[in-house]
């Protein structure tokens, strides 16, 4: 029985290391089993290089039909788990068919890699970048090892960033004017604004501002939409009067935000909204939602 169990053990150990891995920023990433691991951070147009070590277990040799390393950018829908859509696929053949008797090291390099999308782990979808090493074998089955890495892309300040100003209300009952200082915010930004009451004929007991994330996956009849409330702020407690102005000041730094993602590879989108909620004394809710754009500022070091 022990012999049979041993037959299914891999013949070798494969490890993947990055050339500058020790000096590069590490980002926490959640695995499928919920475990948090640290992976190195890159951005588009960087060179991905390092070494692959293949070491046969004691007393074993590895017969193979070639060794290759792939750099893959993949999208996985959780309702179609296990099926990956590759939007980036680069391959390096690093060994010809032969045998490995002892530890062998292979250098690899992918120069100036185009990585247009950021790593994303959502409710129904994930986008990941991974190095995949394959020791190709026939009857014995190929041996495969993966190493994830994280991609974040930075952009400069937008040249145009208009404020958001809108008047909303219920006829003859409630009219408010809200204003936010910008329509585009970086991930460490502060949302500034004000809520101005033009007409108040219903008894409002409190007002909140929510930050919401809406993730859309799939297309057409197969579209899945998930909305999360990431943060909620009480702007006012008590009844406002006509002419009253309520300030808005929201720091984005504490929250787990990503940039806005628009129709990534025709697979998914991630949008953010500011949702203004007013509650009257009869617990009726009045709300107005406004989309904002989030981006990762180039000057950020995180």
From Swiss-Prot:
Keywords in alphabetical order: Cytoplasm, Endosome, Golgi apparatus, Membrane, Protein transport, Transport
Enumerate the Gene Ontology biological process terms. intracellular protein transport
> What's the superkingdom here?
Eukaryota
Q: Membrane topology type, per the record?
A: Peripheral membrane protein
Respond yes or no to whether keyword Transport is given for this record.
yes
Where in the cell? Cytoplasm; Endosome membrane; Prevacuolar compartment membrane; Golgi apparatus, trans-Golgi network membrane
Can the keyword Cytoplasm be found in this entry's annotation?
Answer: yes
- GO cellular component terms attached to this protein's record: endosome membrane; Golgi apparatus; intracellular membrane-bounded organelle; membrane; multivesicular body; retromer complex
- Could you tell me which Pfam families the record lists for this protein? Vps26
Q: What does this protein do?
A: Plays a role in vesicular protein sorting. Component of the membrane-associated retromer complex which is essential in endosome-to-Golgi retrograde transport. The VPS29-VPS26-VPS35 subcomplex may be involved in recycling of specific cargos from endosome to the plasma membrane.
Family (UniProt): Belongs to the VPS26 family.
Quaternary organization: Component of the retromer complex which consists of VPS29 (MAG1), VPS26 (VPS26A or VPS26B), VPS35 (VPS35A or VPS35B or VPS35C), VPS5/17 (SNX1 or SNX2A or SNX2B). Component of a retromer subcomplex consisting of VPS29 (MAG1), VPS26 (VPS26A or VPS26B), VPS35 (VPS35A or VPS35B or VPS35C).
- Protein name in UniProt: Vacuolar protein sorting-associated protein 26A
Gene source species: Arabidopsis thaliana
Q: Which gene encodes it?
A: VPS26A
